[in-house]
Amino acid sequence: NFIQNKEDYTFELYDIDPKCEKAIKRDTLENPPCYDNKFVLTNPPYLARNKNKSKELYDKYNCNDLYKCFITNLIDSNCIGGIIIVPLNFICSIRKADIELRRAFLEKFTLNTINIFEEQVFDDTSYAVCSIHFVKNTTGADIASKIKTHIYPSNKVIDISLKLENNYTIGGEIYNLPVSCEYKVERATKSTKNKENITNILLKCIDDSLDSQLGFKMVSDEERYIDNTENLSARSYATLVITPNISIEQQTLLVKKANAFITEQRTKYNSLFLTNYRESNTIARKRISFELAFMICNHILGLN
């Protein structure tokens, strides 16, 4: 039903494990077909480097996930457009290498429509995914033009821009917040020297459910979380260390304002500026980085 006049087109079908008699058995990452002057419709494999024993393809494309290897192939081709189904992090990740991949893709192609699926789509992966309709940019159109984005199952429709000013990231303007030089915000670890500046502000970095989302809260001295792991590798919780130290009253006000700011941004951008947490359940769970959380606190402290 997608193509009405099929007789006017030539189709090529490739699959590493063909289920259709017309499909050609082929590993299209190991041995890519020619995409030049073709419309590509596919759902490439998603598999992170650290989940795969074989590192050959990751080394070949200098990528850390198989779907990014495919994206690299598209960028290097003369493809005229297509529809791809890829992890949502392709348009949300704030990793430097991912931003660079997104920039290269956007310089080559114009994104016409994005569909975001916040419920699990595939039985074999809990990744939040999106489908992207793109065409080759032949007119030099503004890379920052708005992209119509549909979100399911809520049926929300938003316009997004992916441009240099927001690091080609949805809601990426938040990473350019002005911050105060007067305050330093970090987290409490076994290496923390200025113990007197350890606050009673606990940062929860991952959504658990609709009723237990990421954010800040005041806790007792006994509930403060100190990262005592060998390599300081804890990423789910952090107790803030603020220099110079601030009073309990100031801490309480900071928690209130920081949570309100995060809620405002999550509503504005449908939480898409936050990294997707793979194990989603009743909601599309998100993760906030220490760096962004500390930046938000520093920004708010500087406003007072």
Spell out what each predicted region is.
Residues 1-38, 42:
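Conserved S-adenosyl-L-methionine
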Residues 47-66:
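Mobile active-site "lid"/loop adjacent to the S-adenosyl-L-methionine
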Residues 1-4, 22-24, 51, 93-97, ...:
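A short acidic (Asp/Glu
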Residues 18-19, 45-47, 89-91, 121, ...:
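Short, solvent-exposed loop/turn segments at secondary-structure junctions
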Residues 46-49, 89-93, 191-193, 246-247:
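Short acidic, S/G/P-rich loop/turn micro-motifs used as interaction or catalytic elements
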Residues 63-120, 126, 131-133:
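Conserved Class I SAM-dependent methyltransferase catalytic core
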Residues 125-189:
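Flexible, glycine-/basic-rich loop-and-beta segments that form/coincide
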